[in-house]
């Protein structure tokens, strides 16, 4: 059984309470987004989940679910046949990372525009 509270804490700690799409601070009411969608076989694991504002998740015009092609290019959505670890995520500050099973960023390219 998935421990959602624990997963939320791990993801929130990793992103330091910033939205992993827009870079603005998160409130208690944020979405855990499956990069590899559950409909594509995605798992409820810290290395497959990112923290997003609801408008960045599925409510806003620039949300990942309304812009699948762009979200796939930036790694916010992972193709069905890809492993999330092997499909880098572009953070709002321009850094490119892999998400680890320990709940950390593995930096491929690091930029410190937001202090991440």
Model-derived features: where do they sit?
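Short Cys/His-centered divalent metal-binding micro-motifs
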Residues: 24-28, 49-73
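Short linker/helix segments within small regulatory modules
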Residues: 36-49
């Amino acid at each position: 059984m998935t421990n959602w509270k624990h997963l939320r804490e791990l993801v929130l700690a990793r992103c330091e309470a910033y939205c992993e799409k827009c870079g603005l601070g998160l409130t208690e009411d944020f979405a855990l987004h499956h990069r590899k969608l559950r409909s594509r076989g995605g798992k409820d694991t810290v290395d497959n989940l990112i923290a997003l504002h609801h408008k960045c998740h599925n409510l806003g015009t620039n949300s990942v679910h309304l812009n699948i092609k762009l979200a796939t290019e930036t790694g916010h959505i992972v193709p069905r046949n890809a492993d999330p670890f092997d499909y880098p995520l572009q953070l709002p500050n321009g850094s490119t990372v892999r998400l680890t099973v320990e709940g950390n960023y593995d930096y491929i390219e690091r930029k410190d525009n937001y202090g991440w």
